[in-house]
Each structure stands twice: as structure tokens, then as C-alpha cells.
Amino acid sequence: MLLVSQGANGGFMLGPSLRAFGAYLIFLLFPLSALPQRQSFTVGTASAAVGEKSTGYLEVPAGVDAATDIPVIVINGAKPGSVLALISGAHGTEYASIIAVERLITLLDPAQISGTVILLPLVNIQSFEQKVPHVNPVDNKSMNRFYPGKADGTQTERASFLITKQIVDRCDYLIDYHGGDLDESLRPYAYWAPTGKEAQDRVSKEMVLAFGLDHIIIWRDRPTDLGATRYLDSTSTARGKASIVVEGGYASTVDEDDVALLVNGTLSTMRALKMLPGDPRPIENPVWFEKTVDVIAEGPGIWYPLVRRGTYVQEGMKLGYVTDYFGKRISEVRAPVSGVILHINAIPSLKKGDNFADIGVVVSHAP
């Protein structure tokens, strides 16, 4: 057994046995349990150990109005990695997107995941249960218009504040899911909001392409003031997190093709982010839009659309007409610009300020 030998320069060297003994001594003094270990990940009342899945609630406390609980799921992957937030149901009758995120709860296996996934499948429970489109019926506010929220505000503002602190501030990436509400006949599309920050924009563009929706709006004028970001994705983007918005489903229907589109897009995006094994399936030649133009009703009446979602229209083309309550035609609605009908009002009911249609204006050069 050689513990020490003399080196060529006259010094002494540790022999292999002594080196082995030293390693053993270090092991005794510093056992593996003393090394940094991955911890449980907790959001609200959901706490998942490594390799586990947990459900719970974000508990929004009572304030000027009632308290509410928002369902939350934490999937803490078996391998280390990034944190991804998947959030839907800000508008509780955009059902296809809600069902898609709910389906992901069971599909995502923590054993396959690198990193952590936080899912909020249904932010606006009151809207969902009472079948009220667009707003939270408790305070009549959209749950995607009051970010970053207020700790002492109304229920929508308090919920937005909690989501910002508990999820947005802790995630690396975020996907915000929406779709066609009760009155919106919508064709699937996504939003990509470049910031001018090369690294962040590169990742968010990779995400939106990996998701696979073939129509993408370039949103360049998202709010950037951290205290008034308004939208969920703007709140995340302004804080340096790569984020996208995806839209699928029309007029509150739950079409399996729309649900599958959102589910498969999420899995592909997770592969692009190296959070799931396998290769993403990015869309290769999407249609890019430089802006959207809303067509707004000037007064009430009964709406008769003449075009469908996804139709390409020329400026001046008739989109539909409006009658009074006696059947008399009182106005015709024409396209103010040329572009694609991303969604069109799906129901006859009409009041002043309603949106007849949303037209996407195609870019001259893809980004």
C-alpha cells in the first residue's frame, strides 16, 4: 500500500491509497445530504415535491368585495429546468382554451418534465359558473385588463395582484390562453410581442413558432410601464419573461380540433424550451399581421354577418348589415381595411360600442 511517494522534483506526492482515503474522509465530513438539493415548489396551497404533481388554490382574500379561490396545479419535474406558467380562463366562457389547459393537467407527467409547470386552468370562476362573457360579474371588470393588480382593489384587481406575485414574478416563460367568447366567431391565431431585447425576443419568437398556430399578430405597442401593464402577457413580458398569447375555439364552443390544437401546441412549445423530450413541430410559413383593426357598432340593432371567420376581405367589402327591431335595414357594415377576419360577431344581439369584427392586416415582410 503506497501512501506517499517522492516525485521527480524531490517533492512528495500522495499515493493512490491516500487519495482514496482523502475522498472517503470528505464523504464522511460532507455527506450527499449536505449538498444543495432541489426543493418542493409551492404556489398558493399547492406544493409539489420533485417528481410530483399537486393541486390547490390561490386564495384571493376578501376586500371591498368577496374572496375567491383560483384553482392551481404545480407539476415539479423529476429533472431540473425552467419554470413555465400556463394560464387560461381569464374570460370564463372561452371554453376551448379552459378545457385544453385542464387536459394538460393529466397529460403532463412529472417524470418526463425538466423544470416546473404552473397551471391556472380557470382564473375567472364567477364568469364560468354564471356563464357571463368578457368580465368578472363580481366587479364587472375583465380579468385580463387590470394587471399588475392591486392588493386593496376589487376582486379582479386583487386576483391580478396575486397572480403577478405568485406566478409571473416566479416563472421564466408564460403562455396565456384565450379563444372565441360567446359572441366571437374566431379562427385560431397567436400574439407575439417583440421588446427590442434580442435574447428575450428570440425565445418568445421560438415559442410562438413552436406552438404552431398559422396566423400570428405582431403586437408592438403592448404597455411597458411596470405599474400599468394591463394585460397578463404584457406584465410577464415587461418583467423580462418570454411570453406568448394563443387563441383557439369559437363562440364558446368546445370543438375537439380546437382543443387538440392548443394541447399539441403547448407540448411542442415545451419541447422547444427543453422541458419535454423530443423535437418541437414549429409552423414553417405562418401569416404574420402588423396590426388588427376593430370594426365598432355605432348603435344597437340586430346584426346579420355576411362573411365568416378566416375570410380575406378587401377594403370596402360588405361584412354584414344591421336592422332595427322591426326588420328595417338601418346600416351596412364595410371593411375599413383589407385583411383577414380573425373574428366576427357571432350573435344577432348588438349595442353601441360592440365589435362587429377584428381584421388582421398582413405584413409586407415577415419578421
Regions from the PLM with identified roles:
Residues 5, 14-18, 35-367:
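Structured catalytic-domain cores with a bias toward divalent-metal coordination
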